Every structure is written in C-alpha cells, then in structure tokens.
Curated annotation (Swiss-Prot):
Biological processes annotated in GO: intracellular protein transmembrane transport; protein targeting
Domain of life: Eukaryota
Bilayer-crossing regions: 43-63, 97-117, 144-164, 168-188, 201-221, 226-246, 289-309, 334-354, 390-410, 414-434
Family: Belongs to the SecY/SEC61-alpha family.
Keyword annotations of the record: Chloroplast, Membrane, Plastid, Protein transport, Thylakoid, Translocation, Transmembrane, Transmembrane helix, Transport
Name of the gene this protein is made from: secY
Descriptive protein name: Protein translocase subunit SecY
Function of the protein: The central subunit of the protein translocation channel SecYE. Consists of two halves formed by TMs 1-5 and 6-10. These two domains form a lateral gate at the front which open onto the bilayer between TMs 2 and 7, and are clamped together by SecE at the back. The channel is closed by both a pore ring composed of hydrophobic SecY resides and a short helix (helix 2A) on the extracellular side of the membrane which forms a plug.
The keyword Membrane is annotated on this UniProt entry: yes
Source organism (scientific name): Heterosigma akashiwo (strain NIES-293 / 8280G21-1)
C-alpha cells in the first residue's frame, strides 16, 4: 500500500454538489451527464453479463439433466460459500459456466497466503511495479486453470451416476469443457475490471447473490407474519446486520499527515494539509474471514462427528452424541466466530504491513503529527491497525453469530444466503459502482469545460 494509491482512492472522488452554477446549467440534461464513454463501458458490462447467462443456459453433454433435477433437492454446493458467477442453485442445471468465478477466487486466496511464506512473491508484488503485477496475473491464471481442472474432475466424477454410458474419456471431455468455462469466466471478470466501473470478481459474486435473493426472500417469508413478534425480530436482525455492514464498509479512521515541503503560504498550506491523510478501514480483510471460516467449519464439523462416533463406540461419554441441535448450533456459531476473528486479524496483516507504510511515508517526506518517522511511526501504525482490525473482527463475528442463531430459531433459509459477507459484497459493489460512475461523469464534465474555455 503506497501513500499515493491511498490518497488517490479517496481524494479523487468528488461530489456532484461541487459543480458550480454555470456548470450545472451547461450539463443539466441527464443525457449529457451520462457520457459516451460511460455508456460504452456500461454496455460492455451488460454484454458480458449476457454472455454469462448464455453460458449458464448451455447444458453439459452426456448428462441426464432431468434425472439430475429430480435428485437436486440437496444440490452440490459448487461455488463454496456463495462465490460463483451464477451457481447451480440458481439455474438448477449443470452448464458450461457451472464452476463460475470460484477457481479464480481460490487461486487469489492461495497466492495471497503464499506471500507470507515466500518473500520473493512479496517482493514481486510490492517492488517490481507493473512488470511484477503482470507476473502475478499470469501466476493467478495458471493456478486458476489448475484448480478448475481439479474441481472439474471431482465434480464430474461425483455426477457419474447421471452420465450416459460413463467412461474415463467422457470424464476427460466434460472436465475440459468445465475448465474452459471457468477460464472464460476469468476472462470476463478481467474485462469487467478493465472497464474501470467495478472489480470483475466482486461483480460476478454480486450477480450470484442478487440472482438467488428474491427466491430466498419469498421462501423465507412465505410462512412468516412480519407483524408478529417473530417478524419484528427478523426485521430488527436485518436492520442491525445491514447497519453493521455499512459501518464496516464505509467507516474510515483518518490519520492526518504533514509534509514541510508542501505549501509555501498559509492558504496553500491549509488546502494541502486538509487533503493529506492516511485512511484505514475497520474491516481491511473484507469478506475473506467469512469465506475462510465457511470452508473450514464443515471440515471441523465432519471431523468432530467422526471423533464423537469413535468415542461413543467405547461408551465412554454416550451423552456427547445426543446433544440437542440447539447446543450443536450454538457451539458451531461460537467456533465460527472465533475463526472469523483469527482470520480477520491474520488476513488484515497480509493486506497492509505497517512497516511498509512507515517506510513509504519516510521516503515520501511525510510524517504523522507528534510521531517521529521510522520506528516510532511503525509502532504507532501497528497499534492503531491492530485495534481497528480487532474491532472490525468482533463486529463481523457478532453479526455472523446473530444471523446464524436467528436463522436457526425461526428456520429462515434467507440468513444462509444473505449473510453479513453477502451484505458487505452487495454494499461494496454498489458503492464502488456509484463512486466510479460519479468520478467518470465529473471527469468528462470538467474536460468539456476546460476544452470550452481554451
């Protein structure tokens, strides 16, 4: 994280209210505000989404889709915890794009974890600039292909009962088709990112959540009276978790910066100092802690059941295997909350290294008021960063536990598909799109004004 990147991401977003009266008169019509460049980018994204829909509608050959649909009440969770472009849960069909963005997401996670183990990768990410970034993209693509092939083989092998005349050759063919679909999704994701409107991977996850949300809401509230006590509890829970998602996503801790070389007079100095700050989010790790915990909980649960069955076979603690469901759910929620806190603290450390930030500040000639550059700055940033990460982790964990318990008590499936992670993704993507569109519009407005005044 460099100072310039930090500063640009927040100071370049200008509010439309800053346009003066003359500019508003000139560019009032809506058709003028939505510029040609913006229209092209939005149309590009719409076309790419249409391609995804077509790909999902193309069924895989050799598979008895009718038989598969009849046995799909407990469909394979192909996308992990909601991380696919459009999952099989939404389409109820095994199609070309069934794997979605999952292999790419998993590849990115694995590479980020590898940065901790391999210092050369960390150096490649931080010090080699554009060439290093291109190498990392290439590594991500290779790893995505490897994961897509692996996931395809396991998926097709698990569906062998629904495949006409099962053979190893058909396993190879279908795996190639699914892997190709995953790589096409990766290409679409990169194309969406290049439009500058939003991050491609996040947008595809956003599409997945939105595609299944209406059905989940309808099923969950079908037998629930929203004016009853249970309905009020559900509405209150939604309000709390949505507020928490907004708070985690939008709250910034601002550290003002000083630079003695900038600003020669009082007015210039004041303007410069007001625009210099180091922003830290409460939730630097985003939804990754929830994703990690979602992957790990089923493994721990399966292992725990196996151990309990082994213990029960010796009749040592027979009461353990007869725990009521509410106790099991409570223990699972507590373990998940603990894992989320651990992963949030760990993953936040991967995203921002206070030592690197302190070094970058010192090289750029910036310092924090009343804090000496170097070691003192690093210690101060570490302290602030740990406190913010802990607060964000606790809020994240509390909301996950709250949604799990309320969903379990009132038997609401919507809380599984509309978790705090989903809310953060939805809010983050919508906010990013609005900010990027606003910035593009203002950039074009000021460009026209500048050209007109020449």
């Amino acid at each position: 994280m460099t100072l310039e990147k930090n500063k640009d991401s927040f100071t370049n977003i200008i509010d439309l209210s800053l346009i003066n009266k003359e500019q508003k008169v000139t560019f009032t019509p809506t058709k003028e505000i939505y510029t040609e460049l913006l229209k092209k980018r939005l149309l590009t994204i719409a076309l790419l989404v249409f391609i995804i829909k077509i790909g999902m509608a193309i069924p895989l050959p050799y598979i008895d889709q009718t038989k598969l649909l009849n046995n799909a009440t407990s469909m394979f969770d192909l996308s992990g915890p909601g991380l696919a472009a459009v999952s099989a849960r939404a389409s109820q069909k095994i199609g070309l794009f069934t794997l979605g963005i999952t292999p790419s997401i998993n590849a990115s996670i694995i590479l980020q974890l590898a940065f901790v183990i391999n210092p050369n990768l960390k150096k490649l990410q931080r010090e080699e600039g554009e060439s290093g970034r291109r190498k990392l993209i290439k590594y991500t693509r290779y790893l995505t292909l490897l994961l897509a092939i692996t996931q395809s083989v396991f998926l097709i092998f698990s569906l062998r009962a629904f495949i006409f005349e099962w053979s190893i050759l058909k396993l190879f063919e279908l795996s190639c088709v699914l892997s190709s679909g995953a790589m096409i999704i990766l290409w679409i994701s990169e194309c969406i990112t290049k439009t500058g409107i939003t991050n491609g991977s996040s947008f595809l996850i956003f599409l997945n959540i939105v595609s299944v949300l209406p059905e989940q809401i309808g099923m969950s509230f079908k037998n629930l009276d929203i004016f009853s006590f249970e309905g009020l509890i559900v509405i209150l829970t939604f309000s709390i978790t949505v507020w928490a998602a907004i708070f985690l996503q939008q709250t910034l801790y601002i550290i003002p910066l000083k630079n003695p070389k900038l600003g020669q007079n009082e007015l210039t100095k004041k303007l410069v100092e007001d625009s210099l700050y180091l922003p830290f989010r409460l939730n630097q790790a985003g939804v990754m802690p929830v994703v990690f915990a979602s992957y790990l909980i089923p493994i721990l649960k399966t292992g725990g059941i196996y151990i309990l069955l082994k213990i029960n076979s010796f009749n040592l603690f027979p009461f353990l295997i007869k725990f009521p469901e509410v106790v099991n759910q409570s223990l699972e929620s507590i373990v998940e909350a603990g894992l989320i806190c651990l992963f949030a603290l760990f993953y936040s450390g991967l995203i921002i290294d206070p030592k690197d930030v302190a070094d970058e500040l010192q090289k750029s000639g910036f310092f924090i008021f009343a804090i000496r550059p170097g070691e003192k700055t690093r210690n101060y940033l570490e302290k602030i960063f740990k406190e913010l990460s802990l607060i964000g982790a606790l809020i994240l964990a509390f909301n996950v536990v709250l949604l799990n318990l309320v969903g379990f008590v009132f038997n609401l499936s919507i809380f599984k598909g509309f978790s705090i992670g989903s809310q953060i993704i939805l809010l983050g993507v919508v906010t990013e799109i609005l900010q990027k569109v606003q910035a593009l519009v203002l950039n074009d407005v000021y460009k026209r004004i500048r050209d007109r005044n020449k």
